[in-house]
Every structure is written in C-alpha cells, then in structure tokens.
Amino acid sequence: ALTEVVRRYPNTRYAADARIKIDLVNDHLAGKEMQIGRYYQRAGRWLAAATRFRTVVETYQTTSHTPEALFRLVESSLQLGMPEEALKYAAVLGANYPGSKWYEKAYRLMQKHAPGVAVK
C-alpha cells in the first residue's frame, strides 16, 4: 500500500511520508533477519545463519544492518571452511564501509583465521 502511494503520487508529502515508513519497515525486517541469523550462529548452524545474513545484504542493502550482515557472512564463511568466500564479503565490507567497526573486526578475523587470503 505504501509503495502504491509512492508510485501514484510521487511528488506529494504523502509519498515522502510513505518512503520514510517503507525505510523503517525494511530496517525492522532486516533487524529480524539479523536476530534470527545470530540465533543460528549461536546454535552452530552456520549455513542457516549465512542464508539469513545474505538476505539482509541482498534484499535490505540500504538498511543500517548491512555492515554487520557482511561481517557475519565473513564469520560464517570461515566457519564453513570457505576463506575465499569470506574474503569476498570482507572486500565488499571494506569497499563500502571502510571505517566501520565491522570492517575492523572482519580484517582481524581474516588475518587470524585465513592469513593466506587476508584482506589488504
């Protein structure tokens, strides 16, 4: 319904309000995906966790949860024995969020667990 308001009446204050609400809903949905992914990580279900974090990166990439999701994908990939995949996520994290705490943590994690493919 909110996207319909934006589509039909793009230059109104209602559309602006609808865009804000859409962003808030997406951020909330991404937060729930993160919560479920973290639960799976704690349970040692790394593949299920990675699937949830990948959903955040692919579907909710404009939300505040994306940097953490990328970091969690680095963690999950390393746990699944895929250091090259972890490097890919760390590189995306470094390119898009170079000063973030999540990039710093990913960098240290890569150096510790996959020094042969460490992020530069």
Language-model features: locations:
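Acidic, polar-rich low-complexity tracts and alpha-helical solenoid repeat scaffolds
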Residues: A1-K120
